UniProtKB/Swiss-Prot annotation:
KW tRNA-binding (keyword) present: no
Function field: Cytochrome c oxidase is the component of the respiratory chain that catalyzes the reduction of oxygen to water. Subunits 1-3 form the functional core of the enzyme complex. CO I is the catalytic subunit of the enzyme. Electrons originating in cytochrome c are transferred via the copper A center of subunit 2 and heme A of subunit 1 to the bimetallic center formed by heme A3 and copper B.
Binding of Fe(II)-heme a, residues: H79, H395
The EC number(s) this enzyme carries: 7.1.1.9
GO molecular function: cytochrome-c oxidase activity; heme binding; metal ion binding
GO annotation, biological process: electron transport coupled proton transport; oxidative phosphorylation; respiratory electron transport chain
Protein name, per record: Probable cytochrome c oxidase subunit 1
Length: 532
């Protein structure tokens, strides 16, 4: 791709300074940076919560939290909601999406800059509401799924669950507004000559994700609003004594909840495609197949939601359909895995930190995918449902998969964002500590699940003690790795070497590498022309 660009030095024009620059910012780069900082902060908080309940689970007896099992449930709930809505989505979709989509398509900014500002700032009150809910009336001990009747006014009297519901309303609104912005930007603001099928795969992944958010989030909003009125205004959507059905809530929640796991992982797929192509010095293998796989994953993700509900009493035909549909998702996912491997095959591969995290992602995601095939079988799921086998499965895919893509993207683009290049040896140490830590945490949970240990239980028989101790040690290592990552960020900002325009060489051929590091405040005011 021959790229001609006009590097304008208007950095200082119309740039507000101090706190106003960040509070009132309509610049996509500033907002992307704020999303990433917010995500790192929320991720540390959510990680500390998980460390607390892993310490509780390290030994049987329930002594660490002093037998306060409501607190245990609140920690479980807060950990999940923070990691999904306040860590991984703001990092991948909000942070990298906002910062790099305009750069990758040659746009001067996002289509609706002020909408972009409110999309970010809605997250802050949402996070405060969620944190505050933990200190009100014992906190929301419902799990992130908020199932009634546990989340009903009889199961949780007081304002805690209502605050959590309003928190989800705000974060959902933030996501929907951000999605509208990104869709309009991608369709209307591409540089001349950049057709849809010339866009980098990261842009495609954000586009598909944005459509998923717009289709899925309102369903969650409707479900939790119905729960809110059940709790406060006497409706009986989910109360059996008034003709309602709590299983209806599960259908509504998981109709959002299953697309949500693809909302979390799809931007990561895009990042991995960019990174593997760059460090294999080859174009991505099967570009159109990769695009098609993402679109198919997005579509099929909407029609398999009840595989989360195999034990609620679905009809035999429904079990067959949802089992088959879930297994079919393995096909487009397999296309992506094999295309990444084919891209590396025969390439001039180097292994800097972003590439290590991408390869680590492929390994972890494949393990999680294999256990997903096992869980998709409704007969086997009767045994494994709500055990630690499920916890291991979704952490290997949604959590470790998405987390490793976030780290890959961060190390890949950190020099471009900050103008400082991280020390390679520190990044590689971070990768290996994280890789060992997360596998030590979650791999033993497969064995616990197969042995029958249920999820969300603060105490357990001594037979499960060994693997739980291993898992808790792994959680400590993983948390240490996360804090080490924060150290690397600050160390790089203070002592890092200046990053060249393109630190990665010939393989990095997308538009952002034609700009300075960091890019000027206003970029592509004259659109670049994309030629074959």
């Amino acid at each position: 791709m021959d790229i001609t660009t006009n590097d304008l030095n208007h950095d200082d024009h119309h740039t507000p300074h101090g706190w106003k620059r960040w509070l009132f910012s309509t610049n996509h780069k500033d907002i992307g940076i704020m999303y990433i900082i917010f995500a790192i902060f929320a991720g540390i908080v959510g990680g500390l919560f998980s460390l607390l309940f892993r310490l509780e689970l390290a030994m049987p007896g329930g002594t660490f939290l002093n037998h306060d099992f409501q607190l245990y449930n609140v920690l479980i709930t807060a950990h999940a909601v923070i990691m999904v809505f306040f860590m991984i989505m703001p990092a991948l979709f909000g942070g990298f999406g906002n910062y790099f989509v305009p750069l990758l398509i040659g746009a001067p900014d996002m289509a609706f800059p002020r909408l972009n500002n409110i999309s970010f700032w809605l997250l802050v009150p949402a996070f405060i509401l969620l944190m505050g809910s933990a200190f009100v009336d014992g906190g929301p001990g419902t799990g992130w799924t908020l199932y009634p009747p546990l989340s009903s006014i009889s199961g949780h009297p007081g304002a805690a669950v209502d605050m959590a519901i309003f928190s989800l309303h705000l974060t959902g609104l933030s996501s929907i507004l951000g999605s509208i912005n990104l869709i309009v930007t991608i369709f209307n603001m591409r540089a001349p000559g950049m057709g849809l099928f010339k866009m980098p795969l990261f842009v495609w992944s954000i586009l598909v994700t944005a459509f998923l958010i717009i289709l899925a989030m309102p369903v969650l909003g409707g479900a939790i609003t119905m729960l809110l009125t059940d709790r406060n205004f006497g409706t009986t959507f989910f109360k059996t004594d008034g003709g309602g059905d709590p299983v209806l809530f599960q259908h509504l929640f998981w109709f959002f909840g299953h697309p949500e796991v693809y909302i979390v992982i799809l931007p990561g797929f895009g990042i991995v495609s960019q990174v593997i192509s760059t460090f294999s010095r080859k174009p991505i293998f099967g570009y159109q197949g990769m695009v098609g796989a993402m679109v198919i994953i997005g579509f099929v993700g909407f029609i398999v939601w009840a595989h989360h509900m195999f034990t609620v009493g679905l009809s035999y035909n429904a079990l067959i359909y949802f089992t088959a549909g879930t297994m079919i998702i393995a096909i487009p996912t397999g296309i992506k895995i094999f295309s990444w491997i084919a891209t590396m095959w025969g390439g001039s591969i180097t292994f800097p930190t972003p590439m290590l995290f991408s390869i680590g992602f492929i390994i972890l995601f494949t393990i999680g995918g294999v256990t997903g095939i096992i869980l998709s079988n409704s007969a086997l799921d009767r045994v494994l449902h709500d055990t630690y086998y499920v916890v291991a499965h979704f952490h290997y895919t949604m959590s470790l998969g998405a987390l490793f893509t976030a780290f890959a993207g961060f190390y890949y683009w950190f020099g471009k964002i900050s103008g400082k290049q991280y020390p390679e040896i520190l990044g590689k140490i971070h990768f290996w500590i994280t890789f060992v830590g997360v596998n030590l945490t979650f791999f033993p949970q497969h064995f616990l699940g197969l042995a029958g240990m249920p999820r969300r239980i603060p105490d357990y028989p001594e037979a499960f003690a060994g693997w739980n101790m291993v898992s808790s040690i792994g959680a400590g290592i993983s948390m240490a790795a996360a804090l080490y990552f924060v150290f690397i960020v600050f160390y790089t900002l203070k002592y890092g070497k200046d990053c060249p325009n393109n630190p990665w060489g010939d393989g990095a051929d997308t538009l952002e590498w034609t700009l300075t590091s960091p890019p000027p405040f206003h970029t592509f005011e004259t659109p670049p022309h994309i030629e074959e």
